[in-house]
Curated annotation (Swiss-Prot):
Effect the entry attributes to changing residue 286 to S: In CLN2; enzymatically inactive; lacks one oligosaccharide chain resulting in enzymatic inactivation and possibly prelysosomal protein degradation; altered intracellular trafficking
Effect of residue 422 to H: In CLN2; displays no residual enzyme activity; altered intracellular trafficking;
Name the record gives this protein: Tripeptidyl-peptidase 1
Residue positions of the active site: 272, 276, 475
Propeptide: 20-195
Originating organism: Homo sapiens
Keyword Signal appears in the UniProt entry: yes
Biological processes annotated in GO: bone resorption; central nervous system development; epithelial cell differentiation; lipid metabolic process; lysosomal protein catabolic process; lysosome organization; nervous system development; neuromuscular process controlling balance
Catalysed reaction equations from the record: Release of an N-terminal tripeptide from a polypeptide, but also has endopeptidase activity
Effect upon mutating residue 475 to A: Inactive. Impaired processing
Mod. after translation: Activated by autocatalytic proteolytical processing upon acidification. N-glycosylation is required for processing and activity.
């Protein structure tokens, strides 16, 4: 059957399922641990589905990202506006017409788009959705630490073949909400009392990374930062105020968030949400802070997609965004990963600095055809984000040199090839490291991460008005590094320079200047006889455990202030 035949009678094709294809044949549909099915959804129940429409000029977008992010380029710092990006990538008129005609034929009338017109979110009944997407069968599920309810399909969906050039994927069918990987570790044993700290607080962060009481935002510049939250949990203003009363006495700070984008619920505060806000606002002290709250409260929504669509619908955004979200690369479809990567590319073109946590499972581990391999995570493995690993103090109660935090995520992507900006650093690591795992465990030619690191072990957090000690994870290191970059943006903006934007090309060109090199320790991996739980190990220069290292603020400011 030819394309013209497929285009004729779309509604009949929806009903018959003929002349169809699967956009996400490789999407994992196994039920994540901790989730249970509650049975079929009511046919008249409504859900929302997000249609990712095919974009134009993605290769040109990639070239522009390189041009505006490379300090040696005459285009460096000349970022695109949202309108520029929209003009470049907006779906073709044929794509817009074809998809809209198909949706209208199926009775989908409650739809809204974004400025770039490349996402379309529609509300449909379950009955309509199952007719629209042959093969889909929607069930209720409950799971996660907060007993979250979602509607998902355990079966693959199909689209009419006529839509193959026009739709990348449909969101809201398979992917389950992320879960927090934060750990609360046992308190280490104290062996002395001189010069001790009793856990990581803002004063410990500021001392270790050489931030003085004067290293805060001016409160007068057009500078802002943001964190994004997807775990159906919230921060509380009262917790932030108490945290600053307890730990913010030695530096100027803001005790409230400037703006919440999305839904801010009234339930109990979440530790991860509290951690993100409290340490972004204490490292990037006295800088206007936004919180993107995309909890995915409606059962059909994918909260990470919601956040990406918010970025595509706001012309004026904070310069630095920190995100503590990730999934195993192998759990996601190729169509989804490639499209999300393009969204991250769009943000880089606009001069946004996106920082993602590297994860808290070391190198990870899974079995492929009976053999163990390391397990990279995404979006940490995207070549268009700066990924943050984790460290611990060499002496747990002393502000000393840092070593690897054994949970710090890192490794090599199985999806994205190594970007040119890190070719020299990664090649040097692979040729000089004395402790490389067997080559069968990782893809040595893939995008390597993390890029940088910060302390990730033993934080104090205030949640539901209770100070909680020994919270650990790269969800802690990421907002700390983000706040420090916001302070550098403050100096750049006040001196008439553009914000840092996508950092990696510059970071790798400067070979770790302005960072403390972390050279001791290894992270965890597969518990088998061959690697015995050990992944990669840190060493001089860049490594796939702590990247280039942790921030030394005065030196990093000097390195990144010009041009």
């Amino acid at each position: 059957m030819g394309l013209q035949a497929c285009l004729l009678g779309l509604f009949a094709l929806i009903l018959s399922g003929k002349c169809s294809y699967s956009p996400e044949p490789d999407q994992r549909r196994t039920l994540p641990p901790g989730w249970v099915s509650l049975g079929r959804a009511d046919p008249e129940e409504e859900l929302s589905l997000t249609f990712a429409l095919r974009q134009q000029n993605v290769e040109r977008l990639s070239e522009l990202v390189q041009a505006v992010s490379d300090p040696s380029s005459p285009q460096y710092g000349k970022y695109l506006t949202l309108e520029n990006v929209a003009d470049l990538v907006r779906p073709s008129p044929l794509t817009l017409h074809t998809v809209q005609k198909w949706l209208l034929a199926a009775g989908a009338q409650k739809c809204h788009s974004v400025i770039t017109q490349d996402f379309l979110t529609c509300w449909l009944s379950i009955r309509q959705a199952e007719l629209l997407l042959p093969g889909a069968e929607f069930h209720h599920y409950v799971g996660g630490p907060t007993e979250t309810h979602v509607v998902r399909s355990p079966h693959p969906y199909q689209l009419p073949q006529a839509l193959a050039p026009h739709v990348d994927f449909v969101g809201g069918l398979h992917r389950f909400p992320p879960t927090s990987s934060l750990r609360q570790r046992p308190e280490p044993q104290v062996t002395g009392t001189v010069g001790l700290h009793l856990g990581v607080t803002p004063s410990v962060i500021r001392k270790r990374y050489n931030l003085t009481s004067q290293d805060v935002g001016s409160g007068t510049s057009n500078n802002s930062q943001a964190c994004a939250q997807f775990l159906e949990q919230y921060f509380h203003d009262s917790d932030l105020a108490q945290f600053m009363r307890l730990f913010g006495g030695n530096f100027a700070h803001q005790a409230s968030v400037a703006r919440v984008v999305g839904q801010q619920g009234r339930g109990r505060a979440g530790i991860e949400a509290s951690l993100d806000v409290q340490y972004l606002m204490s490292a990037g002290a006295n800088i206007s802070t936004w919180v993107y709250s995309s909890p995915g409260r409606h059962e059909g929504q994918e909260p990470f997609l919601q956040w990406l669509m918010l970025l595509s619908n706001e012309s004026a955004l904070p310069h630095v965004h920190t995100v503590s979200y990730g999934d195993d690369e192998d759990s996601l479809s190729s169509a989804y990963i490639q499209r999300v990567n393009t969204e991250l590319m769009k943000a880089a073109a606009r001069g946004l600095t996106l920082l993602f946590a590297s994860g808290d499972s070391g190198a990870g581990c899974w079995s492929v055809s009976g053999r163990h391999q390391f397990r990279p995570t995404f979006p940490a493995s995207s070549p268009y984000v700066t990924t943050v690993g984790g460290t611990s103090f060499q002496e747990p109660f002393l502000i000393t040199n840092e070593i690897v935090d054994y949970i710090s995520g890192g490794g090599f992507s199985n999806v994205f090839p190594r970007p040119s900006y890190q070719e020299e650093a990664v090649t040097k690591f692979l040729s000089s490291s004395p402790h490389l795992p067997p080559s069968s465990y990782f893809n040595a030619s893939g995008r390597a991460y993390p890029d940088v690191a910060a302390l990730s072990d033993g934080y104090w957090v205030v949640s539901n008005r209770v100070p909680i000690p020994w919270v650990s994870g790269t969800s802690a290191s990421t907002p700390v590094f983000g706040g420090i970059l916001s302070l550098i943006n403050e100096h750049r903006i006040l001196s008439g320079r553009p914000p840092l934007g996508f950092l990696n090309p510059r970071l790798y060109q400067q070979h770790g200047a302005g960072l403390f090199d972390v050279t001791r320790g290894c992270h965890e991996s597969c518990l088998d006889e061959e690697v015995e739980g050990q992944g990669f190990c840190s060493g001089p220069g860049w490594d796939p455990v702590t990247g280039w290292g942790t921030p030394n603020f005065p030196a990093l400011l000097k390195t990144l202030l010009n041009p």
